[in-house]
Swiss-Prot record:
EC supergroup of this enzyme: transferase
Source species of the chain: Chlorobium luteolum (strain DSM 273 / BCRC 81028 / 2530)
GO molecular function annotation: amino acid binding; aspartate carbamoyltransferase activity
Protein name: Aspartate carbamoyltransferase catalytic subunit
Keywords: Pyrimidine biosynthesis, Transferase
Length: 313
């Protein structure tokens, strides 16, 4: 696996590098789920700044757990209680934290390109924990690992990404990563929520959910940002749910057993029904991987931090 200095996105990342991260994740997953987990403190003494300008539950806590499992300490950052409220720029915030001798940055920011920007002004490793509508690479890695763990490979599996693709950083990173690893990707959404360049992405396009589900081996359901219903993208949340909500009734029509993923948080009974979201065992036409994704998120972030801080000279 080629040496990584930063992880700002999956666009342009080689299949070899992706495979290396997924292989390393597999090792950490085995340790993480062992009856008595015991981790090597390979990052002992390292300090990781979690710089989150947006709210987060799964991503922030899993990065914190990943760091602690490897022996590193974390510094929490909240924009609302920092000098950002006094007008301090992102650049100055990062430079000041670097001057405190932190060893790496995990950044979540509402502006697309922010992670790439700070990777150019610091010598420390930068991990993108979500930047605007651009990318969310560790979420895509955990989605890909979840799929690979179930199917044994990513090559030739068909993944339908359903929902608000236009505004989704999760969708973008998954498209880049899955296609690189040889998977087939389908996008299913109202035309108002598809990116204008969708036809150039090398994906299949669907506006009919039944057709997409009949094509797919797995469904990655995206969180619908509720403001889209008032922003002119959708007639109403109810109409969206009728046409694009993942329910047992709709799955039964496809007569296929699908793996169901969702990055969270869930809008229950809008993009996905309670029964589909919570079903982890048969009978039924689907298996929910939502909590498995959360577990895998810790292992993926351990692999990323280990690669950037311990394995890179």
């Amino acid at each position: 696996m080629a040496a990584l200095q930063h992880l700002t996105g999956l666009c342009g990342m080689s299949a070899g590098t992706l495979s290396g991260l997924l292989d390393k994740t597999e090792g950490f997953k085995k340790e993480l789920t062992a009856p008595a987990p015991s981790f090597s403190p390979s990052l002992q003494g390292r300090r990781i700044a979690l710089v989150f300008f947006e709210n987060s539950t799964r991503t922030r806590f899993s990065f914190e757990l990943a760091a602690r499992n490897l022996g590193a300490s974390t510094l929490g950052f909240s924009a609302s209680t920092s000098s950002v409220t006094k007008g301090e720029t992102l650049s100055d915030t990062i430079k000041n934290l670097e001057a405190m001798q932190v060893d790496a940055f995990v950044l979540r920011h509402p502006s697309s390109g922010s992670a790439e920007f700070i990777s150019g002004i610091t010598k420390k490793p930068v991990v993108n924990a979500g930047d605007g509508a651009n990318e969310h690479p560790t979420q895509a890695l955990l989605d890909m690992f979840t799929l690979r763990e179930h199917f044994g490979t990513l090559k030739a599996i068909k993944v339908a990404i359903i929902g608000d693709v236009l505004h989704s950083r999760v969708a973008r990173s998954n498209i880049h990563g899955l296609l690189t690893m040889g998977a087939e990707v389908g996008l299913c959404s109202p035309v108002t929520l598809l990116p204008p360049d969708s036809e150039k992405l090398g994906v299949s396009l669907f506006t009919d959910l039944d057709q997409a589900l009949g094509w797919a081996d797995a469904a990655l359901v995206l969180r619908l940002q509720l403001e889209r219903a008032t922003g002119g993208y959708l007639p109403s949340l109810q109409e969206y749910s009728v046409h694009y909500g993942l329910t047992d009734e709709r799955l039964e029509r496809t007569a296929r057993h699908l793996l169901v993923l969702h990055p969270g948080p869930i809008n229950r009974e809008i993009e996905i029904s309670n029964r589909v979201a919570d079903r982890i065992q048969p009978p039924g036409y689907s298996k929910s991987m939502l909590l498995e994704q959360v577990t895998n998120g810790v292992a993926v972030r351990m692999a990323v931090l280990q690669t950037l801080l311990a394995d890179t000279p």
